[in-house]
Amino acid sequence: GPGPHIIMDHLMEHSNVDFQWGNHDVVWMGAAAGSPLCILTVLKTTLAYNNVDTLERGYGIPLRCLEHYAEEYYAQSDLTRWMPHADPNATDVRPANLARVARMHKAVTVLMLKLEAEVIARNPDFEMQGRDYLRQIDYDAGTVRCGGKVYPLLDCDFPTVDPTAPERLLPREEDIIARLVRDFKGSEKLQKHVEFLFSQGSVYSCVNGNLLYHGAVPMDEDGQFTACLLYTSPSPRDYAAS
């Protein structure tokens, strides 16, 4: 939603605050730490909801280089499916501004898919090969394979994607990502907010015999917990309620 930086300012004034991190919290922490893929994920969500002010004014993160890049490659694109979910009470819902945001939204999504392809290829144990969408596309037929089925693409305009190596970044794209990493890591206010979020939060906590968590716990069809591969060892507090 709009103004998360304002909410964080208010929360930091309280003496007793704790968080159970959700997926968006973790992505923002990753972005502040300089993860390119987390940064692009944050940007995609921000642009999809026309919440650019949070980045540009709230955290002082300029998007000019991204805007120029999107204008160059997607100025003639059909942006119908990339238009942001505009709040009618937002400060700028002019068609020209919405088109600007839509171009950046598409540009960021393609960049994000390129980086996702690299991560999936480097980590076969994630078993996410089916989510490597750029490699699931038949660029000649204009279709994509998803969940074992083939669907027609609603947008086939990929001027920056090489079908033979879809994850490959253009030199300009590498430069844009490097600038975004620098600006996210260099935002003093963002770093302050994320440090507070990190120091006062956890993925879950056990309080009075209750497990507090955000999101969902994996279960099977019979309502039993499913086994999960963890990339860290359990801590003593995992057994606090047992």
Give the residues covered by each predicted segment.
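Feature recognizes metal-dependent phosphohydrolase scaffolds
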Residues: 1-238, 242
